[in-house]
A protein has these predicted regions:
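Carboxylate-rich, polar loop motifs that coordinate divalent cations or form catalytic acidic clusters
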Residues: 1-169
Length: 169
């Protein structure tokens, strides 16, 4: 972390105890300027919340059998959505509520949605559409307001389809 005011770097390393980063392999970052919070997605360490003002960490991990936790401790991307975070993981996507630390796993009930497992990237366009890059499954678009999920895949018979189903970001 770089403190612009003091012009100093602060290094965070995994240490025993709850007040450190959970893993040093970082895959995703999102800075919430309104709350001065850095959300850190790690590879095998789940999601970390760093409160810049206090320097305190909070960890969010997958708990087997608990659908209100992360679908995986391998976090690939983080995107803000209203007062929540869309978390892309190695085992699907969830809508994370920072207020209570709970996840709502998305797309578990639809045939198309069950294809969304190894998610490489998520982003929103200017119309509020969520775009999902799912390794091996192409690209998905999702509208929260309508619940419409669309899968775009490579089709050798269609020269206008995407070029490959392995989309990383």
């Amino acid at each position: 972390y770089y403190n612009r005011r003091t012009r100093e770097f602060k290094w965070f390393r995994p240490e025993i105890g709850p007040n450190s980063i959970s893993h040093n392999n970082i895959k995703a970052l999102y800075y919430d300027a309104s709350k001065d919070i850095i959300w850190i997605g790690t590879h095998l360490g789940g999601l970390n919340r760093l409160d810049i003002r206090s320097g305190r960490f909070t960890h969010y991990r997958m708990e087997a059998g608990n659908p209100e936790t992360l679908p995986s401790d391998i976090i690939r991307d983080i995107a803000p959505y209203q007062d929540h975070l869309v978390i892309a993981t190695q085992n699907g996507i969830c809508l994370f509520d920072p207020a209570n630390g709970k996840c709502q796993q998305l797309f578990q009930d639809s045939k198309e949605g069950k294809k969304i497992k190894m998610v490489a990237d998520v982003t929103f366009d200017s119309n509020g559409t969520l775009w999902i890059a799912a390794t091996g499954e192409g690209v998905f678009s999702y509208r929260f307001d309508t619940g419409k999920l669309t899968n775009y895949r490579h089709d050798t018979a269609d020269p206008h389809s995407i070029s490959n189903n392995n989309v990383n970001n």
